[in-house]
Design a protein with these regions (language model features):
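DNA major-groove recognition helix of helix-turn-helix
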Residues: 15, 40, 51
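Short alpha-helical DNA-recognition segment
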Residues: 19-38
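Short, basic-rich loop-to-helix N-cap that marks the start of a DNA-contacting helix
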Residues: 43-54
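Residues within the helices of the helix-turn-helix
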Residues: 12, 23, 53
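Short, charged recognition helix plus adjacent turn
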Residues: 13, 38, 67-80
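The alpha-helix within a helix-turn-helix
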Residues: 15, 26, 56
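A short, Lys/Arg-rich alpha-helix, primarily the initiator
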Residues: 1-20
C-alpha cells in the first residue's frame, strides 16, 4: 500500500471510530469536505502535513496518534 492510500484509509477508520461523517470532520477541522474527500480518493496525490494536522486537531488526536497504526508499517517504497 502506498502512503496516500494509507492516509485515506486511516481517515475512514478514524471517522468510524469517532462515529462522525466526513462532513462533520470537515466542520470540526475548519476545512472544506472536498479537501478531506480528495485525501481519501485519487484526486489528492500527496496529502499535506498541514491538512493532516487539521484533521488531527478536529479529532483531538496528535499527529503521532494518526500515524501510529499498522497501516503505515509496510508502505510501498517511493524511490525504487
Amino acid at each position: 500500500m502506498n502512503a496516500k492510500d494509507a492516509v485515506g484509509l486511516r481517515i475512514q477508520v478514524l471517522c468510524a471510530k469517532h462515529e462522525i461523517t466526513v462532513n462533520e470532520l470537515a466542520r470540526k477541522c475548519g476545512v472544506a469536505p472536498s479537501t478531506i474527500y480528495s485525501m481519501m480518493n485519487e484526486k489528492s496525490k500527496n496529502p499535506g502535513v498541514v491538512s493532516i494536522q487539521k484533521i488531527c486537531d478536529g479529532l483531538d488526536i496528535s499527529v503521532r496518534d494518526f500515524f501510529n497504526d499498522s497501516l503505515f508499517e509496510n508502505l510501498d517504497p517511493v524511490i525504487k
